[in-house]
Amino acid sequence: MRKRRRQPSLAQLRAFAAVAEHLHFRDAAAAIGMSQPALSGAVSALEESLGVTLLERTTRKVLLSPAGERLAARAKSVLAEVGALVEEADALQAPFTGVLRLGVIPTVAPYVLPTVLRLVHDRYPRLDLQVHEEQTASLLDGLTGGRLDLLLLAVPLGVPGVVELPLFDEDFVLVTPLEHGLGGREGIPRKALRELNLLLLDEGHCLRDQALDICREAGSAGVAATTTAAGLSTLVQLVAGGLGVTLLPHTAVQVETTRSGRLLTGRFADPAPGRRIALAMRTGAARAAEYEELAAALREAMRDLPVRIVRD
């Protein structure tokens, strides 16, 4: 007779999914708020329950076994479905209550989050908003995998199973050192970008990709930047130090340029290069009506920002 296996617990699946994502016990434990011994024990218990080896452990690294490779996606799917179940139950209780896990890209978070947080505090006091700042690829993985509920980021995404709720459009502004010839000018033609030493964010930031697209549209063969930065604050200081120029979203200009007296901003001729910011949710999300209402409220709250509100 075939031995009856014990059913794996959600904690075991969550531990395995975290290790499969990070391939590192310490990072995986930190990601889900579990101690390393507890994480290791949960994965071992899952292996015993399933009767297969999921991980190949060495003194230097952790790898997924062939069985682990196959079952990691299934574990992620199960956790996403459980998350959707809890989400739907929360939505049935009362709108705008319970936990809302919001993912935000780094080039939006410092400049737009204050408006979001004020709105939630004033209008939705029973909503437990949890903010996660990550790059776009990580946010999308979190949304589709059920780790996050809603995203605030640049679009279009073009991702199946993800619905975009546009909020606003904003222009990019050229930031230069004081002595630069384009500093403070209005009506700068895009073709001027062909001759500029444009400083960019590191790989993985969507703002970097947008800047490269703008350069290509202007007729530049591409930017071979030898200097990059992990954040806009560092990027602006590099400009102030005379290493080049950069593009900033208009919402970031006041925060990032007032710290240095050695910067000027220039505006592009219409139509200026820019980006669209939106909320993004899973197709068929149980709380879709709430998210749409939140998007409408955010559009009204963001009228004082230097942006153009997108009416749904």
Swiss-Prot record:
Domain HTH lysR-type: 8-65
Keywords, in A-Z order: Activator, DNA-binding, Transcription, Transcription regulation
Matches recorded under InterPro entries: LysR_subst-bd, Tscrpt_reg_HTH_LysR, WH-like_DNA-bd_sf, WH_DNA-bd_sf
Source species, domain of life: Bacteria
UniProt-listed SUPFAM superfamilies: Periplasmic binding protein-like II (SSF53850), Winged helix' DNA-binding domain (SSF46785)
Coiled-coil residue spans: none
GO MF terms, alphabetically ordered: DNA binding; DNA-binding transcription factor activity
Keyword Transcription regulation: yes
Family annotation (CDD domains): PBP2_OxyR
Entry GO CC: protein-DNA complex
Annotated region of DNA binding: 25-44
Record's keyword annotation contains DNA-binding: yes
Functional summary from the UniProt entry: Required for the induction of a regulon of hydrogen peroxide inducible genes such as catalase and glutathione-reductase.
Family statement: Belongs to the LysR transcriptional regulatory family.
Protein name stated in the entry: Probable hydrogen peroxide-inducible genes activator
Source organism: Streptomyces viridosporus
